[in-house]
Amino acid sequence: MKRRTGQDQSITRQWRPATQAVRGGTARSEFGETSEAIFLTSGYSYDCAGDAAARFAGEQVGMTYSRLQNPTVEMLESRIALLEGAEACRTMTTGMAAMTAVLLCQLQQGDHLVGGRAAFGSCRWLTDTLLPKFGIETTVVDARDPQQWIDAARPNTKVFFFETPANPTMDVVDLKAVCAIARERGITTVVDNAFATPALQRPMEWGADVTAYSATKMMDGQGRVLAGAVCGTSQFINDVLLPFTRNTGPTLSAFNAWVVLKGLETLDLRIRRQSENSLKVGAFLETRVPRILHPGLASHPQHNLAMAQMDACGPIFAFEVDGGRQQAHGLLDALTLVDISNNIGDSRSLMTHPASTTHYGVAEDKRIEMGVTENLLRLNVGLEDPQDVIEDLDQALSKVGL
């Protein structure tokens, strides 16, 4: 039936990614709507008590409660899994809900996790503060160095967890090498792929077991809603992750799922155009600031690795001034086009000072260890004409003496 073509994986897995992003997962109702329907309902009715009992027993196909299943949410999950090349996906309320769930569902007291040093501030809180409360130990390594992963692994190590590119320092992790180290030891690799999205990087193709996302970022792409996602094998999603999420309740709403579905339709176009814009803006800044951390530029120490793993550089990068927080804040305050915002992945250009925003809650010694100094600024380049962004940065840099 054509109205369910988007659910037929024998068809959809033959499509190219740009087509999958528009049509993957779509299941039209009897009305034949061209845009996915929003099923704003908390529950579902049954024709008889026996049907209700059969559904809860898993003997009858159908919905029971929107904390567990929702047609709009399931369309989004099918589409993300398709783009990722994964067997299954589970969405959640936020990216951090996804990161928390993907770790807690598979770790218990006495287990050990190895995590990448460069990470989003809340992810470092999760591994450094929350997990130890449950008797789970974490070792932090420079994720760029495969030998450090080897040295940190123990008999009780259950998970390798890292971002690539990392937020906000743009560290790039050798996916093939680190995933191979984990697989040889029976360790599950969880990759936060939010900066790249499956449009630019598919970690599972390099050996990752699980990928996790803040779908708030590039997947939505317009700064509208919060959402998170985890992709993996059907066994992992249904047997390991789902029991945790269905009983703890980080359920994505149907409306937010629909918004992300709409965002995915333009993901391929947006992220490639923003990558092009980012390169142009980065090339300009490279001539004006003391240091730039942009994986798309040859000056990045891991440029070759980044370009081998990614289809394009992405819209986000970091750079440094030389006058500390005062100069960094002065630069932000002098901007007239670029917004001061701690979000990323938006169609608008956004800039933030991570040490005083996204990583404010990280202890100073850990921030410095991560490379999040008072000089560091993070820039998300949007869909504006890059020359307008460059001119705004030019005048702001001049005002702070750069």
What residues fall within each predicted segment?
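A common structural junction motif
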Residues: T248-G249, A334-G345, A396-L402
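Conserved PLP-enzyme active-site core in the AAT-like
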Residues: G6-T12, A18-E30, A88-L293
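Glycine-rich beta-alpha junction loops
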Residues: T26, L40-Y46, F195, K217, ...
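Conserved C-terminal alpha-helix-loop-beta "cap" of PLP-dependent enzymes
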Residues: L293-L377, V381
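N-terminal "arm"/small-domain region of PLP-dependent enzymes with the aminotransferase-like
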Residues: K2-N70, S78
